[in-house]
């Protein structure tokens, strides 16, 4: 049995949305599940979880790659606001808040024992004036 990535996506989405409601810098951004979500606005934050298996899979512990893609349209959201959103996501998912993150991801069948930041990739498309930043995280899920 592999971990339910869609559950992790949904729970992380809800977790990030809770910070929007609290007035964090993510206010005004659409948060969606999956990079290929059908109804994406021009500027959005997409969360995708992919089971990567890993060396501990035989013991019921799975590694999962979590990608958070922040995309903004230059005319819609200025670059400074884009950068602020990226930093807000990184801050929300920082180690100091790990207990809240794990509580948001865990469910009756699976427990996430950690979420580690692995880096970011940035890209800009001058023809469409879009800016994107993909944040990479690795999580470990155990079957309860």
What are these regions (language model features)?
Residues 1-29, 48-144:
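Charged, amphipathic alpha-helical segments and their flanking helix caps
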Residues 30-40:
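Short acidic low-complexity segments
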Residues 35, 43-45, 62:
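N-terminal, polar/charged subdomain of small-to-medium soluble alpha/beta proteins
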Residues 39-44, 125:
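Short, solvent-exposed polar/charged micro-motifs at secondary-structure junctions
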